[in-house]
Amino acid sequence: MNLAWLQGLSLGLLSPPAPALLIFRSFTMAKVLVSDSIDQVGIDILKQVAQVDVKTGLSEAEIIDIVPEYDAIMLRSATKVTEKIIQAGSQLKIIGRAGVGVDNIDVPAATRQGIVVVNSPEGNTIAAAEHALAMMMALARHIPDANKSVKESKWERKQFIGTEVYKKTLGVVGLGKIGSHVAGVAKAMGMKLLAYDPFISQERADQIGCTLVDLDLLFSEADFITLHIPKTPETANLINAETLAKMKPTARIINCSRGGIIDEEALVTAIETAQIGGAALDVFAQEPLGESRLREFSNVILTPHLGASTEEAQVNVAVDVAEQIRDVLLGLPARSAVNIPGLTPDVMEKLRPYLKLAETLGTLVGQLAGGRIDRLTVCLQGDLAEYTNSQPLVVAAIKGLLSQALRERVNYVNAAIEAKERGIRVIETKDASVRDYSGSLHLKATGTMGEHSATGALLSNGEIRITDVDEFPINVPPNNYMLFTLHRDMPGIIGKIGSLLGSFNVNIASMQVGRKIVRGDAIMALSLDDPLPDGLLSEITKVAGIRDAYTVKL
């Protein structure tokens, strides 16, 4: 992939621009606030270009008081960089998270202020993978309880008879970098590998040595289940009473990814009733872990979020993020910006209005497609077809496509690489003959669940409009919560959907129907004020005339 367009920082989105920044540095040393414990090697890198103040344990109010004097903040997981802090940081140019997750940073607020947010997506990969494997082995061989027993001067060999992992089935939920490394080591240990990841191709799974299956089969067949997925609305409480009931009574669950993916109360019930064989958890819905019955069970291992807590990982993430902060303060690109692409000012001026459009359409077709995606086609239409450097738009579309599955792990720098690793073929086409708008984008996602497409354009005031979905003409702005229905164009169907939504207390903000012929197929696009409650989408698909329904979050 040609990354020439990344050689200049997106100064069009930043304030001040590069020349002003360099003049600023000639007279005044930049200042960096380090608000959490960071390895000294990272601080030393920052000191090459800035005055560094290490102030840990500050409250939000305390940070708000001092942040106006800083050009950058470097943090780990303890500090919460809220919208209020960002608004107070009038000089902030970059916020760096020494780790993978950026859920403790208000990224949209930072983006609105033109502040770059960076992370270290690979710095703790090995540490997190090894911790998951260690938890699996500790669970299989009762190591924590056996250790405690011997230290109490006991010798209870029969009580701690374990199980081998050799020839057992490991179910890996999420085959990103961490999940793939876990799978590779487990394969070397002689384990059979099942995996679920809707964004991984079978070819990539074959390279890792996994058999791709659906979640139901994975849950029912696996002896050990390890989770390596971000927390999203779709993955929250993925492990719940219903999914636990599908597992073997000897199944053991390992979660070293994100808290909130497991319904902890349901897990307590499953452990208490011997519905599953055990669990090893490094992350929790609320941290630090408060009152919890999980502490009561000998077959539950708990650690205090140690996935990235190795000397090597702490050095890796500190160096990675400190170097990016240094580079941005010098007017250079950040290699792992999660919110802003690295564009030169002239390219940014032309394409900036369309980046959000491309990302929005990518998010839309990704959610409509649902299953694993094999191909993404991005067509630049009208005036956009004349741009020679259109690569940023393609990357923005990929970022949107993968955003629901990967969240903070996908950014403008790594989006194309993430797509390639998942076996997604990206095709760019151009069609200057389309003149419905001065410039528009058409995206088509093809995968295991079929093919879905969407077209969008910008109004003269810069507002985004979705102009067709699955080749049905519409004209609607994107909304946080949206519902799309494919149905037969017939009297009464709109009223039925409206009544059904109303019965669940879901308010409709706007609605539009697109059709090609009278009484033929049609699509309904509804913007909602509220997310759909559990079970409502299924009820909608039961309405006579409804052929399919999709809920989308934009």
Curated annotation (Swiss-Prot):
PANTHER family: D-ISOMER SPECIFIC 2-HYDROXYACID DEHYDROGENASE FAMILY PROTEIN (AFU_ORTHOLOGUE AFUA_6G10090)
Alphabetically ordered keywords of this record: Amino-acid biosynthesis, NAD, Oxidoreductase, Serine biosynthesis
Catalytic activity, reaction form: (2R)-3-phosphoglycerate + NAD(+) = 3-phosphooxypyruvate + NADH + H(+); (R)-2-hydroxyglutarate + NAD(+) = 2-oxoglutarate + NADH + H(+)
Pfam families, alphabetized: 2-Hacid_dh, 2-Hacid_dh_C, ACT, PGDH_inter
GO molecular function, one term: NAD binding
Annotated pathway: Amino-acid biosynthesis; L-serine biosynthesis; L-serine from 3-phospho-D-glycerate: step 1/3
Positions of the catalytic residues: 258, 287, 305
E.C. numbers: 1.1.1.95, 1.1.1.399
ACT domain ranges (all copies): 482-554
Gene name in the database record: serA
GO-annotated biological processes: L-serine biosynthetic process
Purpose: Catalyzes the reversible oxidation of 3-phospho-D-glycerate to 3-phosphonooxypyruvate, the first step of the phosphorylated L-serine biosynthesis pathway. Also catalyzes the reversible oxidation of 2-hydroxyglutarate to 2-oxoglutarate.
Phylogenetic placement of the source organism: Bacteria, Bacillati, Cyanobacteriota, Cyanophyceae, Synechococcales
Similarity comment: family membership: Belongs to the D-isomer specific 2-hydroxyacid dehydrogenase family.
Domain of life: Bacteria
SUPFAM superfamilies: ACT-like (SSF55021), Formate/glycerate dehydrogenase catalytic domain-like (SSF52283), NAD(P)-binding Rossmann-fold domains (SSF51735), Serine metabolism enzymes domain (SSF143548)
Sites where the protein binds NAD(+): 177-178, 197, 256-258, 282, 305-308
UniProt cross-references to NCBIfam families, sorted A to Z: PGDH
Protein name: D-3-phosphoglycerate dehydrogenase
